[in-house]
UniProtKB/Swiss-Prot annotation:
Pro-peptide positions on chain: 23-45
Source organism (scientific name): Conus catus
Annotated consequence of substituting residue 55 to R: 20% reduction of neurotransmitter release
Tissue distribution of the protein: Expressed by the venom duct.
GO CC term, one of those recorded: extracellular region
Any one GO molecular-function label of the UniProt entry: calcium channel regulator activity
Pfam family, one: Conotoxin
Keyword vocabulary terms for this entry: Amidation, Calcium channel impairing toxin, Disulfide bond, Ion channel impairing toxin, Knottin, Neurotoxin, Pharmaceutical, Presynaptic neurotoxin, Secreted, Signal, Toxin, Voltage-gated calcium channel impairing toxin
Protein's name in the database: Omega-conotoxin CVID
Length: 73
């Protein structure tokens, strides 16, 4: 019972610390990471909007291949 209480208190304390730290650092990040879709388009060859694509290959820069013919959206 004591161990359970200690674990609960520890989790609550760590959660509170995370929330306080996250609130204090909001908007202070200098070098933000690129979004994953931007990284994908910069690191691999991908097809632009309107190009033919394969729904199984995920080869569109936008990430979406739609339609019956398969065009990048």
């Amino acid at each position: 019972m004591k161990l359970t209480c200690v674990v609960i208190v520890a989790v609550l304390l760590l959660t509170a610390c995370q929330l306080i730290t996250a609130d204090d650092s909001r908007g202070t990040q200098k070098h933000r990471a690129l979004r994953s879709d931007t990284k994908l388009s910069m690191s691999t060859r991908c097809k632009s909007k309107g190009a033919k694509c394969s729904k199984l290959m995920y080869d569109c820069c936008s990430g979406s291949c739609s339609g019956t013919v398969g065009r990048c959206g």
